[in-house]
Design a protein with these regions (language model features):
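Helix-to-loop junctions at the C-terminal end of transmembrane segments
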Residues: 66-78, 162, 266-279, 359-360
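Primarily marks hydrophobic transmembrane alpha-helices of the MFS/SLC 12-helix fold
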Residues: 80-83, 283
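Short amphipathic helix-loop junctions that connect adjacent transmembrane helices
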Residues: 36-50, 235-251
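Symmetry-related core transmembrane helices of the 12-TM Major Facilitator Superfamily/SLC fold
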Residues: 172-190, 366-384
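A late C-terminal transmembrane helix in Major Facilitator Superfamily
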Residues: 331-366, 371
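C-terminal transmembrane helical hairpin of 12-TM major facilitator-type secondary transporters
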Residues: 277-324
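Helix-breaking motifs and short loop linkers at transmembrane-helix boundaries and internal kinks
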Residues: 46, 78, 99-104, 246, ...
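Intracellular juxtamembrane helix-capping segments at the cytosolic ends
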Residues: 119-134, 318-331
Length: 395
């Protein structure tokens, strides 16, 4: 058996799929834990909204830089090595944030988290694509579902510690960060043992470097659109329900809960849909569901109908990202993934701020028409996506 065949067999194994699933879950748990800690961190350090925005911007800029470096290194030396090297940055970032007593230290923690998350995001998607190719059946939606589950667990740890330890406000930041860091360290130890080697992806022909394919920029445009649409659902759904339905903030949280739940559900089902209908069709219908959902929340004001609208949004946007990232990885490995993920990440990072400006201009109800239009654009662009289903079983 050749070395290439041996590597393919290792990537096709159940243990390889478990390893990548754990990567996504660990990354989601750290990001969810950090996001869940922000209100408490604000109380602990006495931060205002501008300082929070600065910290998040620094972390986001670090992530975008790490994506470019991590994507190229993943192709050059293997996505396994980059993924495992990124986790310590996440751990260090969580500990730094947890122990921070001044704003400057919190920024350092945010930058460490950004560096780790950016490199890991590209690399774990790259090795996920290789596992999918080796198994010859879709599995990327499943991986992304466990990122969402990990994020939910990380954010839910805030409530768990509050109940078990009776901690509130700034007092919860340090134990939360240390607990998340320990969980990530345990995950890293397991990943070191079970993660198989990933293939090296060359980008030269006869010694000449090949250009980034044109399709990468089309996928990047789609990532911009779904990044803003998904970011809006994550950051604005609860506020939208609260303001439009005229309910209290606790009830308004149904918006985000509904979006998150339906994203997980569709991602657990998504691979079966890809096997049956193909990625282009799944992306089209995902964008259609999301567009109808956003149109619904733009037109209605009753609580039940708003929940239905946000359910459609979650159901729709949950289909799109795993498929776009999978296509990017199949056509160009980590280098193309770095381009596409950067577009999506930038939109996810900056989109909610843009929506905030729009809300101030036209109101939160009518502002939701913008992501509806972007989702309509994804429907049009889906027909230009490269077909990568040929090597996957159609069942």
């Amino acid at each position: 058996m050749t070395a290439s065949a041996t590597l393919t067999n290792q990537l096709a194994s159940r243990i390889a799929a478990i390893a990548v699933t754990l990567m996504f879950a660990v990354n989601g748990a750290v990001i969810g834990g950090f996001g869940g800690s922000l209100p408490s961190l604000r109380d602990k350090l006495g931060l205002d909204a501008t300082q929070i925005a600065i910290m998040l911007f620094c972390g986001g800029a670090a992530a975008i830089l790490a994506m470019q470096i991590g994507g190229r290194l993943a192709d050059a030396i293997g996505a396994r090595e980059i993924t495992l090297a990124a986790v310590p940055f996440l751990i260090a970032g969580m500990i730094t944030v947890g122990l921070a007593t001044v704003f400057g230290v919190a920024i350092v923690g945010g930058i460490l988290l950004g560096l780790g998350n950016g490199a890991m995001d590209v690399a774990m998607n790259a090795i996920g694509v290789q596992v999918e190719a080796a198994r010859q059946r879709p599995i990327m939606s499943f991986f992304h579902a466990f990122w969402s589950i990990g994020q939910f667990v990380g954010a839910g740890t805030v409530l768990l510690l509050a109940i078990l330890l009776g901690l509130q406000g700034g007092a919860i930041v340090t134990p939360l960060s240390i607990l998340i860091a320990v969980l990530a360290l345990v995950g890293l130890g397991i990943l070191f043992k079970i993660t198989p080697k990933a293939a090296v992806v060359p980008h030269t022909i006869d010694g000449v470097k090949t250009p980034i394919p044109r399709a990468a920029w089309i996928l990047g445009a789609m990532a911009l659109a779904f990044g803003l649409s998904e970011g809006t659902a994550t950051d604005w759904s609860s506020l939208h329900v609260t303001d439009v339905a005229g309910v209290d903030p606790t009830t308004g949280a149904l918006g985000l809960v509904t979006v998150s739940a339906f994203m997980v559900i569709i991602r657990l089902l998504g691979d079966r849909l890809v096997s049956r209908f193909g990625r282009r069709t799944v992306v089209r219908f995902g964008a259609l569901f999301a567009a109808v959902g956003y149109l619904t929340v733009t037109l209605v004001s009753s609580l039940p109908m708003l929940v239905v609208g946000w359910a459609l949004v979650g159901f729709g946007v949950g289909m799109i990202a795993p498929q776009v990232y999978a296509v990017a990885g199949h056509i160009g490995g980590g280098r193309v993934l770095a381009v596409v993920v950067t577009f999506g990440y930038a939109a996810f990072l900056l989109g909610p701020a843009f929506m905030g400006f729009l809300v101030n201009q036209v109101g939160i109800h009518h502002a939701m028409a913008v992501p509806a239009l972007l989702c309509a654009g994804i429907i049009a662009l889906a027909s230009t996506m490269p077909r990568t289903d040929a090597g996957l079983s159609q069942r």
